[in-house]
Each structure stands twice: as structure tokens, then as C-alpha cells.
Design a protein with these regions (language model features):
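Short, low-complexity, intrinsically disordered N-terminal peptides in bacterial proteins
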Residues: 1-2, 306-308
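ABC transporter nucleotide-binding domains
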Residues: 2-7, 12-188, 193-207, 213
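Non-catalytic surface loops within mature trypsin-like serine protease
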Residues: 29, 124, 141, 234, ...
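Residues at or immediately preceding the N-termini of alpha-helices
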Residues: 73, 110, 217, 235, ...
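Generic structural signal for individual residues within well-ordered alpha-helical segments
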Residues: 74-77, 99, 114-117, 169, ...
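Phosphate/oxyanion-binding loops and surfaces in catalytic or ligand/nucleic-acid-binding neighborhoods
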Residues: 105, 303-304
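ABC transporter nucleotide-binding domain
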Residues: 172-262
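Short, charged/small-residue-rich alpha-helical element at the C-terminal edge
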Residues: 227-295, 299-300, 308
């Protein structure tokens, strides 16, 4: 099965400065893909190139199995819904009236309006003027507009931006259910992994226009192991044995019976414990610290892809 989105060495430069740098992105069908990176990483520019709103300096984009070009752009975009930057809409009109205008422009049957209103939980507020909506309601209306016509792909640029905690939770639930409720694959951008990790299956991490990581959340977790805390009966003796084995151990000032070791493979760690026991060092406990996904994300983006 072909991916819904593929980019091949995609580049965009402004005045000679690369904003997107040889990006190879792969978004599988039927997933919610989190496109992550700090502000200014190139996420919005990439999304605009996926929609044909910005012309690449180099490389190519494939949407729904077809290379995006001027000849097929409109046909492909009819199968794509998007919410880029702030949600658009006429504030003096109701949500239903806004949706009617877009449905006519898209040549979509107006009967589809009730369906998308129900998906985003705006049915009860459909006849209120959009100017009376909260930011979260406006964001949901933007997604309803994107869903008109049952697109196969949804591209959402930071839809949780500016929302309060309740609004973020509501948006998480809505987007996480999209592949099941609408059949659409979702590409969602954010600069905060913590905001979207509960709704995505796959992640791509962008920094300075380069893709640092792409894979599942589980793969991202495995991408970095935390330090190991070793509790022993004789810390100085244990440190000396470890040094003989080429392992540098630190002694936390507030834990005199504990040594802090760098991340080690399971086999190496098991061998070290055996060596310590054979040397007469009593090993009391062993704790492998786990970095949070947010810590891994920050490490990647702050160190050009090398996890600190």
C-alpha cells in the first residue's frame, strides 16, 4: 500500500537560506502523523508545499500516490482537507452558512454539512454566528470545513495552538478518532510533543529544515535510554571495579550508596553486575531511568539529531 504522502529531497530556500532541506517524509495511510519541531523549523512551509501553495526550490511531493504538479493539483486537493494557520470564516455568518458557502465552492452536496457538524460536535451551535464562538469552536469549524467532501487526507497546522487545556483535550479526542470516523489520514503539526503524543501513531521531527527522526512513538522512546542508577554496599570499591571495566561512574552527592552509569545495552549491564558480584561488591538495586518523550524531543532538536 502506497503512503498517502511522500516527499523526495524536498527543498525550499528564501534568499539563499534553506528553510526546508532535502526532506524525505513518509506518511502511511490510515494514521495520525505528528509533524513536530520548534517554531521556525520549516513545518508550515512544508505543509504549504504539500498543498501547492508554495513552490519547492527542489525535490518533489507525492500525494495519494501521484506526483503533485500543476496539471493534477486541483484534482488532488479535492481529496485533501486542510487547516493552515488561523481558521477562516465569516464572523457575521453562522457556522452552517459558512459551511454552505464552502460546500458550493467545492461542489459538495449541502447534505454533507450535517455530517461534518456532527463529527466536530457543533450541531447544537450550527446556527450561532461564528463571531460568538470561542477559539476552540472556531478551530473545530475549520476542521469541519476541511472535512467537507470526505477527503482522504487532512493537513492540520497546529490546531491546538492557543487553546486552553479543556480545548486541547477536546481537539485531541477529535483528531485521534479521525481515521476511524472519517477514513482520513491526518498530518498534524505542533511544536510541543506533549500536546499531541496522545493522538498520534507516527511522528516526524524537524529542526532547521531537516528531518531528524521518523517512526512510531515507541521507536522514538527506544531512540534514547536514560542513565542507570546502581545501588551498592560499597560505592568506592564498585567505582574502582567499574573503572577497570572501562565504565565511568558518577556518585550523586545526595546518594552516597548510589552510582550513576551511562546508558548501556542489556548484555553489557548484565555482565557488569556479574563482575561486581565476583569482586565482592554487593549490588542492592538497579534502576534504568527512562527519558520522557518530551525530553527526547528536546534533546533531538537542540543537538542536531544526536540524543544527549
Amino acid at each position: 500500500m502506497k503512503p498517502v504522502i511522500e516527499t523526495h529531497a524536498l527543498c525550499k530556500s528564501y534568499h539563499g537560506r534553506p528553510v526546508v532541506d532535502h526532506l524525505n517524509l513518509t506518511v502511511p495511510e490510515g494514521c495520525v502523523y505528528g509533524f513536530l519541531g520548534p517554531n521556525g523549523a520549516g513545518k508550515s512551509t512544508t505543509m504549504k508545499m504539500l498543498l501547492g501553495l508554495v513552490h519547492p526550490t527542489g525535490g518533489s511531493v507525492e500525494l495519494l500516490g501521484h506526483t503533485l504538479n500543476e496539471a493534477n493539483r486541483i484534482a488532488l486537493l479535492r481529496q485533501t482537507g486542510s487547516l493552515i494557520e488561523s481558521p477562516s470564516g465569516y464572523l457575521h455568518l453562522t457556522a452552517r452558512e459558512n459551511l454552505s458557502i464552502v460546500a458550493d465552492l467545492k461542489d459538495v452536496d449541502r447534505k454533507d454539512i450535517s455530517r461534518v457538524l456532527e463529527i466536530v460536535h457543533l450541531t447544537k451551535d450550527a446556527d450561532r454566528k461564528v463571531g460568538q464562538y470561542s477559539l476552540g469552536m472556531k478551530q473545530r469549524l475549520g476542521i469541519a470545513i476541511a472535512l467537507l467532501g470526505s477527503p482522504k487526507l487532512l493537513i492540520l497546522d497546529e490546531p491546538t495552538n492557543g487553546l486552553d487545556p479543556a480545548g486541547i483535550q477536546e481537539m485531541r479526542s477529535l483528531i485521534a478518532s479521525m481515521p476511524q470516523t472519517t477514513g482520513a489520514t491526518v498530518l498534524i503539526s505542533s511544536h510541543l510533543l506533549g500536546e499531541i503524543e496522545q493522538m498520534v501513531d507516527q511522528v516526524g521531527i524537524l529542526s532547521h529544515g531537516k528531518l531528524l527522526f521518523e517512526g512510531s512513538l515507541q521507536q522514538l522512546q527506544k531512540h534514547s535510554r536514560g542513565d542507570i542508577l546502581l545501588r551498592v554496599l560499597d560505592a568506592p570499591k564498585a567505582a574502582a571495579v567499574l573503572q577497570q571495566q572501562g565504565v565511568k561512574a558518577a556518585a550523586p552527592a545526595d546518594q552516597p550508596d548510589t552510582l550513576q552509569l551511562p546508558p548501556l545495552p542489556d548484555e553489557a549491564l548484565a555482565a557488569l553486575v556479574c563482575t561486581l558480584a565476583e569482586s565482592g561488591v554487593g549490588v542492592v538495586g538497579l534502576t534504568a531511568q527512562t527519558k520522557s518523550l518530551e525530553d527526547i524531543f528536546l534533546s533531538l532538536t537542540q543537538t542536531s539529531g544526536e540524543v544527549a
